[in-house]
Curated annotation (Swiss-Prot):
Gene3D superfamilies: Helix hairpin bin (1.10.287.600), Tubulin/FtsZ, C-terminal domain (3.30.1330.20), Tubulin/FtsZ, GTPase domain (3.40.50.1440). Keywords: Cytoplasm, Cytoskeleton, GTP-binding, Magnesium, Metal-binding, Microtubule, Nucleotide-binding. Mg(2+) binds at E69. There are nine genes coding for beta-tubulin. This is Tubulin beta-9 chain. It holds the Pfam family Tubulin. GO terms for biological process: microtubule-based process. GO terms for cellular component: chloroplast; cytosol; Golgi apparatus; microtubule; plant-type vacuole; plasma membrane; plasmodesma; tubulin complex. Its cofactor is Mg(2+). It comes from the Eukaryota. It comes from Arabidopsis thaliana. The lineage of its organism: Eukaryota, Viridiplantae, Streptophyta, Embryophyta, Tracheophyta. GTP binds at Q11, E69, S138, G142, T143, G144, N204, N226. Coiled coil: none annotated.
Length: 444
């Protein structure tokens, strides 16, 4: 079985993770004690991807939970699914990272990291054939960003050939939780570019917009936002967990989505977007799903795909539907909007179909796109970073933990290079390619 090891870090990561496990347990018919109460064999057929079977037929999530302060973990443990996790897999410190990336990456986090790695090793040894890791974290705080990226680089060293997928919550353009978000996010992206295989980019503002605009929720909570994220997370891996006509796994996803190794930041979407109450009315058709899925308003990060071009995209459909219709609809999208796809990657949209729809829906689809417009996110963070860094504002919090200014400069230029790379491929056409390559050789 191709297992996935799930790791959640920091407050944001743990809250998203908690929601995610609620969704996964629901899909596989696992109750709050870890017993199976499902109605079909399909739910248990490949349950090993995310669960370990313990004694007495109890299913235990393959999850590692870490944080530098006990608060979030305590509330998670006393929450509805708190008893399902393996108690040893909660790893937490007492001091907190105080929204400081350096604390998470170099001081506090570095002290805790070995105990986290021990748990990761133990879980990895329990796997038949570990496919990879998925990490939930935010990039604006201290633990998820600093310690999260530290863990990713350590896992990269130890398991170089396993896939590393992250669900990363970026700082939002207008809603800011902490002043130093741009620092933390830039330092994190610097790490993610090098050490992660695929990053699903999320941000709270886009999620709020979906809640207001599409779901018509008057005052959305983080619970509602995390609900959206977990629907997408479940969609990305449903092909591994349920039988389907066209399967994909983390590696197939990466091969189809990443034309150049550094450009592995994806925007994700989900359809049908219905608020939690009104689910039973939405019987959608494949064309409607497709249309909603490609809609710019449904993207879960604050970048507009219409401002760039898709290098590649992938769609996972769930439910009983004809693959022929799926293929027709996807071709249809590409033909009608050909200007939004780079023409030097023909057939750059991959679709997969999984027969089992998510709980409470007839059919659904998850969208993962590699669009050059994601540079808007990086550009925005980079501008805020530069504004503060030029004045060396707040820098003493980081240098006090032993960081060097040089590291900031490197992270800044890595982020700017990334933006430039996206821009280069956005502007590239079929004819220009040879000419650009010659130029690069001359420069080199």
């Amino acid at each position: 079985m191709r297992e996935i090891l799930h790791i959640q870090g920091g407050q944001c990561g743990n809250q998203i993770g908690a929601k995610f496990w609620e969704v996964i347990c629901g899909e596989h018919g696992i109750d709050q004690t870890g017993q199976s109460c499902g109605d079909t064999d399909l739910q248990l057929e490949r349950i090993n991807v995310y669960f370990n079977e313990a004694s007495g037929g109890k299913y235990v999530p393959r999850a590692v939970l870490m944080d530098l302060e006990p608060g979030t973990m305590d509330s998670l443990r006393s929450g509805p699914f708190g008893q399902i996790f393996r108690p040893d897999n909660f790893v937490f410190g007492q001091s907190g990272a105080g929204n400081n990336w350096a604390k998470g990456h170099y001081t506090e986090g570095a002290e805790l990291i070995d105990s986290v790695l021990d748990v990761v090793r133990k879980e990895a040894e329990n796997c038949d054939c570990l496919q990879g890791f998925q990490v939930c974290h935010s990039l604006g705080g201290g633990t998820g960003s600093g310690m999260g990226t530290l863990l990713i680089s350590k896992i990269r060293e130890e398991y170089p050939d396993r896939m590393m997928m992250t669900f990363s919550v970026f700082p939002s353009p207008k809603v800011s939780d902490t002043v130093v978000e741009p620092y933390n996010a830039t330092l994190s992206v610097h790490q993610l570019v090098e050490n992660a295989d695929e990053c699903m980019v999320l941000d709270n503002e886009a999620l709020y917009d979906i809640c207001f605009r599409t779901l018509k929720l008057a005052n959305p909570t983080f619970g509602d936002l995390n609900h959206l994220i977990s629907a997408t997370m479940s969609g990305v891996t449903c092909c591994l967990r349920f039988p389907g006509q066209l399967n994909s796994d983390l590696r197939k996803l990466a091969v189809n989505l990443i034309p150049f190794p550094r450009l592995h930041f994806f925007m994700v979407g989900f359809a049908p977007l219905t608020s939690r109450g009104s689910q039973q009315y939405s019987a959608l058709s494949v064309p409607e799903l497709t249309q909603q899925m490609w809609d710019a308003k449904n993207m879960m990060c604050a970048a507009d795909p219409r401002h760039g071009r898709y290098l590649t995209a992938s769609a996972v459909f769930r439910g009983k539907m004809s693959t022929k219709e799926v293929d027709e609809q996807m071709m249809n999208v590409q033909n009608k909007n050909s200007s939004y796809f780079v023409e030097w990657i023909p057939n750059n949209v991959k679709s997969s179909v999984c027969d089992i729809a998510p709980t409470g829906l007839k059919m659904a689809s998850t969208f993962i796109g590699n669009s050059t417009s994601i540079q808007e996110m990086f550009r925005r963070v980079s501008e805020q970073f530069t504004a503060m860094f030029r004045r060396k504002a707040f820098l003493h919090w980081y240098t006090g933990e032993g960081m060097d200014e040089m590291e900031f400069t490197e992270a800044e230029s890595n982020m700017n290079d990334l933006v430039a790379e996206y821009q280069q491929y956005q502007d590239a056409t079929v004819g220009e390619e040879e000419y650009e390559e010659d130029e690069e050789e001359e420069e080199a």
